[in-house]
Amino acid sequence: MISLGCGPPGKRAAGAERMPQFSTTRRVRHAAADMFALVADVERYPEFVPLCRELKVRRRVAQAEGVEVLTADMTVAYKMIRETFTSKVTLDRPRMRILVEYLNGPFRQMENHWIFRPISEETSEIEFFISYEFRSRMLGALMGAVFDAAFRKFAEAFERRADLVFA
C-alpha cells in the first residue's frame, strides 16, 4: 500500500499538513530483525539508496539495552545539485523502530520513521514514513519532484537489497 499525504496520527511535526509526505507499508519475504539490520546499516546507503551519494556517521552512542543513537551526515545529489544534511538516528531494536530526526541542512523540517513488524519467522511488514519541507522555495521547486520520485523507489531499493543480501 502506498499512500500520499498521510502518516500516523499524532506523529506529524507542526505545519506537516502542508509538507510533502510519503508513506508505504509493505510485506516482505524477510525476517523483521533482518530488515531492521539492513535499514540500520546506514553506512551502506550510498551503495543502493536513490540519490544518496555519501553517508558518514559522526557519532554512535549506545543508550538503553538495544538502543543506539547515531548522528549522521547524508549527502544527496541529483545532476548539479548536491546537499548534505545531518540527522539523529535512533535505532530501537527492542521496539523494532528506527526514528530519524532532522538536525541541520537544506530542510526547514524533516521527519522519518521505520517500523518493522514480524508476521512469521520469514515474513515481515515494514512501514516507512517521511515528511519534509525545504528551507528554500527554489530548492523545493527544483528537488521536490525528484524527492517524491526517489521516495516512491525507496522501499523497493531496500527490498531489492534484502533479496541480494539475504538470498
Q: Would you name each region that the model predicts?
A:
Residues 2-67, 121, 153:
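Hydrophobic ligand-binding cavity/cleft-lining segments
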Residues 19-27, 69-71, 84-86, 109-111, ...:
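Intrinsic-disorder/low-complexity, polar/charged segments enriched in Ser/Thr/Lys/Arg/Asp/Glu/Gln
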Residues 24-26, 55-57, 85-91, 111-118:
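Hydrophobic/aromatic beta-strand elements that line small-molecule binding cavities or substrate pockets
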Residues 27-31, 75-79, 90-92, 103, ...:
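Solvent-exposed residues in well-ordered beta-strands and their adjoining turns
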Residues 35-39, 45, 72, 89, ...:
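Hydrophobic pocket/interface hotspot
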Residues 57-103, 157-161:
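Glycine-rich portal/gate segments that line the openings of hydrophobic small-molecule binding cavities
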